[in-house]
A protein has these predicted regions:
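A contiguous, surface-exposed recognition patch within enzymatic or periplasmic domains that forms
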Residues: 1, 59, 70-78, 82-216
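Extended, loop-rich substrate-binding clefts of extracytoplasmic carbohydrate-active enzymes
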Residues: 3-60, 188-208, 212-214
């Protein structure tokens, strides 16, 4: 079940991830095609849509989100786009060059980045450990960029000399996050449980209106 893009809305780890949704496909004037998916949240009655556009001769997918409050009162929400990215011992997470510190959820812990020099997630990195490398993260770990004036987060696989960029306008979407089950026994067990063939993965997320989780907006 791991893989694809999880849209965390209206709260983190969308409760309806595996529920049926409505969809429609549009053919655009420039030859691109857009698949819109849509659902109504059963708890608060708000509506969320995501449009996936593919272009001829382009290697990226463009995703647009649209949210609607169908009720008469303000409703809280968050929105994080959460793609699964395949990883191995040669994978490095790429945060912008102005990211020098990362936070845990709720900013309850902080670490230097990319070279951690203290205790983070109860792991002793005092000797200096590059936590941008998947192979160095032995326990389930989240980290979110403290601040960045750039519009991307990504990953690079040195074994195949290729990578991925997740691009989002930092004025609207300042959130930049990585999460992993970790490269230890616990994480590897989860990788085996979640997929038959695709192996371990990390999550490289971007979030709107906030740089941390589980912050909500209106």
């Amino acid at each position: 079940v791991s893989g694809g893009i999880e849209f965390n809305w209206p709260q983190h780890h969308r409760p309806s991830t595996f529920s049926p949704i409505e969809y429609t496909i549009e053919e655009n004037e420039d030859g691109s095609k857009t698949c819109w998916v849509s659902e109504i949240d059963r708890m608060y009655g708000t509506k969320g849509m995501a449009g996936f556009t593919v272009y001829k001769d382009k290697a990226y997918i463009e995703v647009r989100g649209q949210l609607y409050n169908r009720t008469e009162v303000p409703q809280t929400f968050l929105w994080w786009a959460n793609p699964a990215v395949e990883v191995n011992d040669y994978t490095k997470s790429i945060f912008p060059p102005d990211v020098h510190a990362v936070f845990d959820h709720g900013k309850r812990d902080v670490s230097r980045f990319p070279i951690a020099t203290g205790v983070y997630y109860k792991m002793d990195y005092s000797e200096g450990v590059d936590i941008s490398r998947y192979k160095n993260l032995q326990v389930p770990t989240s980290y979110m960029a403290y601040h960045s004036d750039y519009n991307f987060v990504g990953g690079y696989d040195f074994s195949v000399e290729a990578g991925i960029l997740h691009i989002a306008d930092h004025h609207i979407s300042p959130g930049k996050k990585q999460w992993t089950w970790g490269n230890g026994d616990f994480g590897q067990a989860w990788d085996r449980n979640l997929t038959d063939e695709d192996g371990p993965y990390i999550e490289l997320m971007t979030g709107v209106y906030t740089d941390n989780q589980p912050d909500f907006t209106w």
